[in-house]
Design a protein with these regions (language model features):
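Nucleotide-sugar donor-binding catalytic core of glycosyltransferases
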Residues: 1-9, 36, 40-195, 253, ...
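Active-site proximal beta-strand in glycosyltransferases
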Residues: 13-28
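Catalytic phosphate/metal-binding cores of nucleic-acid and nucleotide-processing enzymes, i.e., regions
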Residues: 208
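Conserved acidic donor-binding segment of nucleotide-sugar-dependent glycosyltransferases
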Residues: 199-205, 215-219
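C-terminal amphipathic helix plus adjacent low-complexity
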Residues: 211-285
C-alpha cells in the first residue's frame, strides 16, 4: 500500500512471480515520500485523490487509476453507547487524528464549543495553549473510535491542504459509524456522498461556524443525515468493493473508480481557458 519498495525490488518481484504488480497509495500527495513508485515498473497505480491520477496520467503517462478510500463495516458501524460511554465521549464536536499544526490552528476557531480531539499526545514543541482543554492525548481505534464518533453531536473532519480534490478515510469512517460528518469541501465529494443529505461540507471558517450553529440544536436533522450517510457508506464504500474494483482494473475488466467532473482554469498561449476532467477516461477536454 505504501511506497516502501525500491524500483529494483518491484522489478524483481515481477520477474519472480510473473504476475502483475500494483500499488494502492492510500495517502495524500504530501506523504508520497520520494515518489519511487513513479520510477518502478508497476502495472497499475491507484490513488485516492483524482488530482494525483490526472497529473500522473496526463503528464507522465503512467497507468494510474482513481480508488477512493473507504470503510470497514466490521469496525465502522453504529455501536450501542452505555451511560458511562456517553459521559466519557459525549461533546458538541469531536475529531480523531494526529494533532498537526494545521489541525491545531483549525480548532482554535472552535474554542467556544465543547470539543474533544482524540489522538496521540501533541509533540512537545507545539503550543496548544488555546486548545488545551480539547486535547484528550489518547488514541481511539475500532470500537472506541465508533463510540467517539457516535457520541458527539458533530464530527468535524478538516482535511489536509494536501487533499487536493479527494477526501480522507475518516470521511467514510464517520458516516459508517453513524456519526454526523461535517467535512471540508473538496471537488470529489459530490460523487461519493450527497452533500446535505448524507454528509455536510463546509467551505471556510465562517461557513464552518455557521453550520455548527445551525446543526448543534437540530438533533433530528443531524440523526437523519447520519443514518443516510451510514447507509451510503456501507452500500457503496467498503474495502470489499474497492478490492473487487482494483482486481478488475488490474486484469483489464474495469478502469478504476470513475473520476469526478471537475471544471478548472488552465493556462494557454492565449491566456486561460476552462477545462473539464472527463469522468470516463480521466482526460482533459
Amino acid at each position: 500500500t505504501h511506497d516502501f519498495l525500491l524500483p529494483e525490488e518491484v522489478a524483481k518481484i515481477r520477474r519472480l512471480t510473473g504476475g502483475p504488480i500494483a500499488l494502492w497509495h492510500p495517502d495524500h500527495i504530501a506523504n508520497c515520500g520520494k515518489f519511487m513508485f513513479l520510477n518502478a515498473p508497476f502495472d497499475a497505480l491507484f490513488f485516492k485523490d483524482p488530482y494525483m491520477v490526472s497529473v500522473f496520467r496526463k503528464e507522465l503517462r503512467k497507468p494510474t487509476f482513481y480508488l477512493p478510500e473507504c470503510c470497514n463495516p466490521v469496525h465502522h458501524h453504529p455501536v450501542e453507547l452505555s451511560e458511562s460511554d456517553r459521559a466519557y465521549y459525549s461533546c458538541d464536536i469531536t475529531t480523531a487524528g494526529n494533532l498537526n499544526p494545521n489541525r491545531e490552528a483549525f480548532f482554535r476557531n472552535l474554542a467556544a464549543y465543547d470539543v474533544k480531539i482524540w489522538g496521540s499526545p501533541p509533540p512537545l514543541w507545539m503550543d496548544t495553549t488555546e486548545i488545551r482543554s480539547m486535547v484528550m492525548s489518547r488514541m481511539v481505534l475500532n470500537k472506541e473510535k465508533a463510540k467517539a464518533f457516535r457520541a458527539a453531536k458533530i464530527v468535524v473532519n478538516n482535511l489536509s491542504p494536501a487533499e487536493v480534490w479527494g477526501i480522507n478515510c475518516r470521511a467514510f469512517e464517520i458516516p459508517a459509524c453513524e456519526g454526523f460528518d461535517l467535512v471540508s469541501w473538496r471537488p470529489g465529494i459530490a460523487q461519493l456522498f450527497e452533500d446535505g443529505r448524507e454528509i455536510v461540507s463546509f467551505s471556510d471558517a465562517d461557513d464552518l461556524k455557521k453550520k455548527v450553529e445551525y446543526y448543534l440544536p437540530r438533533e433530528t436533522e443531524r440523526l437523519g443525515i447520519a443514518k443516510a450517510g451510514r447507509a451510503r457508506a456501507h452500500r457503496d464504500h467498503t474495502y470489499r468493493q474497492r478490492l473487487d474494483l482494483m482486481l478488475d482494473t488490474i486484469f483489464g475488466q474495469a478502469a478504476g473508480f470513475p473520476l469526478p467532473r471537475i471544471r478548472m482554469l488552465t493556462p494557454t498561449s492565449m491566456g486561460t481557458e476552462s477545462i473539464q476532467l472527463d469522468v470516463e477516461d480521466g482526460s482533459f477536454g
